[in-house]
Amino acid sequence: MENQCLPKKVPGFCSFRYGLAILLHFCNIAIMAQRVCLNLTMVAMVNNTGSPHLSNESVVEMLDNVKNPVYSWSPDIQGLILSSVFFGMVVVQAPVGYLSGIYPMKRIIGSSLFLSSLMSLLLPPAAQVGAALVIVCRVLQGIAQGTVSTGQHEIWVKWAPPLERGRLTSMTLSGFVMGPFIVLLVSGFICDLLGWPMVFYIFGIVGCVLSLSWFFLFFDDPKDHPYMSSSEKDYIISSLMQQASSGRQSLPIKAMLKSLPLWAIILNSFAFIWSNSLLVTYTPTFISTVLHVNVRENGLLSSLPYLLAYICGILAGQMSDFFLTRKIFSIVTVRKLFTTLGSFCPVIFIMCLLYLSYNFYSTVIFLTLANSTLSFSYCGQLINALDIAPRYYGFLKAVTALIGMFGGLISSTLAGLILNQDPEYAWHKIFFLMAGINVTCLVFYFLFAKGEIQDWAKEIKTTRL
């Protein structure tokens, strides 16, 4: 709305909307820690020197007694276990996209976070039973985590002023990289000192505590918040007046299918999650096979990309909103800029990793940069749907996430198959495929992305003569 309608003084960082971003930040840390911890503990859980067993039964080796049980799972089984979380995430996207605009997000996100944490607590005993039960736990965890990661975007339709979207969403989404940083940093030490099962117990308990906090601290609509100042309420409501004035109408499916700006977002979501899932899932494996380090050193090295990614994500949020508030660039230019940085920079550093990494240090540097620069996309295509169709944002995020999850599922599973069949040239094939997908989708985005609300996303007003 017009600037004169907005309050002159509103709380900045010390406000409830930023408090909500921090709360979601910690929730995202929890679900990512629960998802990623298996990537590193798998190194300690599996006997790579023993004969593989393709059955669903876990063969326990007498190693370190109960503290560190070891199983003989083949690379195919390991790849299926690691990627099974994406099966659950894929299944839940469409229902969450529909329900997020109907049911309170307090219940949806709070209960889903609790379910994910419960599955983390149950995973060590499930491993004792067999690989099949581990896969079941991971699928259920994927359903819960997909609900949290997709449903939370609907929150910002009512809570994020347009000129603060970059900062609020980047602060929230940066939890997705801080989670892996924390879990990879400490999991190696936990495995050595307490055994790998304690990794799942610790992060499961943390998630349970956060889910209870969510029920007490979150309110679906800022106008219903009992402790928020009237100035902050007026600021949020006034800034969102244009897009929040009308309720959700029937979905313009045909118009959506014909929308090239929407397809640009969808394809780049596919490329982003393909790359992100691949690097998150297989960075510990790459470090173990290429650099030949122990579990503790593996965890430390695997955590470095996420620390830098966290910094890049926060920096991207500040920069994008700075460009918009100072009117240096238009919305579409900002989205294209950060999408390009988040898609093309990882490709450059992956190629450097394959052809210019001559020693231990150069390998670590290029791998760290390839992982971390993905987070520039937080202020690019990942929030572009909020620009072009705020009224359907929850549904569109579910659709883009659904198609993106297929990318994550395919990349994780395919990488496991390639590593099993062609160990010598596997990483070249895996990374070249990732680079090709990133560049192709980026070109499409650069040609067709938009920053203004599309005609099919505007309220239709009928006039009678």
Curated annotation (Swiss-Prot):
Organism: Mus musculus
Keywords from the UniProt entry: Cell membrane, Glycoprotein, Ion transport, Membrane, Sodium, Sodium transport, Symport, Transmembrane, Transmembrane helix, Transport
Family: Belongs to the major facilitator superfamily. Sodium/anion cotransporter family.
Keyword Transmembrane helix part of the UniProt annotation: yes
Gene expressing this chain: Slc17a1
Glycosylation (residues): 39, 47, 56
Its biological purpose: Important for the resorption of phosphate by the kidney. May be involved in actively transporting phosphate into cells via Na(+) cotransport in the renal brush border membrane. Plays a role in urate transport in the kidney.
Summary of the tissues where the protein is detected: Kidney.
Membrane topology according to the record: Multi-pass membrane protein
GO molecular function annotation: phosphate transmembrane transporter activity; symporter activity
Protein name stated in the entry: Sodium-dependent phosphate transport protein 1
Gene Ontology CC: one annotated term: apical plasma membrane
SUPFAM superfamilies xref list: MFS general substrate transporter (SSF103473)
Gene3D superfamilies registered for this protein in UniProt: MFS general substrate transporter like domains
